[in-house]
Amino acid sequence: MLKLKMMLCVMMLPLVVVGCTSKQSVSQCVKPPPPPAWIMQPPPDWQTPLNGIISPSERG
């Protein structure tokens, strides 16, 4: 059993050493494209046209 543990330790040691010394690859941050122009415009005024179509009913 001791021989098996020793063999596992000897086999794992190079993997640990290589893992600690190797540089991890980091992907560069990609800058997102600017938003389309229509997103930057103010929202349309829908209430004014609807007020002409929909009006409160008159009380009789």
UniProtKB/Swiss-Prot annotation:
It is a lipid-anchor. A lipid is attached at C20 (N-palmitoyl cysteine). InterPro entries: O-spanin. It is found in: Host cell outer membrane. Component of the spanin complex that disrupts the host outer membrane and participates in cell lysis during virus exit. The spanin complex conducts the final step in host lysis by disrupting the outer membrane after holin and endolysin action have permeabilized the inner membrane and degraded the host peptidoglycans. Host outer membrane disruption due to local fusion between the inner and outer membrane performed by the spanin complex. Belongs to the Lambdavirus o-spanin family. The keyword Signal applies. Changing C29S: Complete loss of disulfide-linked homodimers. The keyword Membrane applies. The proline-rich region is an essential fusion motif involved in host membrane fusion leading to lysis. Residues 32-44 are annotated as: Proline-rich. It comes from Escherichia phage lambda (Bacteriophage lambda). This is Spanin, outer lipoprotein subunit. One of its GO terms (biological process) is viral release via disruption of host outer membrane. One of its GO terms (cellular component) is membrane. Keywords: Cytolysis, Disulfide bond, Host cell lysis by virus, Host cell outer membrane, Host membrane, Lipoprotein, Membrane, Palmitate, Signal, Viral release from host cell. Homodimer; disulfide-linked. Interacts (via C-terminus) with the spanin inner membrane subunit (via C-terminus). Part of the spanin complex which spans the entire periplasmic space. The spanin complex is composed of one homodimer of the i-spanin linked by intermolecular disulfide bonds involving two Cys residues and one homodimer of the o-spanin covalently linked by an intermolecular disulfide bond involving one Cys. Pfam families: Rz1. Residues 20-60 are periplasmic. A lipid is attached at C20 (S-diacylglycerol cysteine). It comes from the Viruses. The gene is Rz1. Residues 1-19 form the signal peptide.
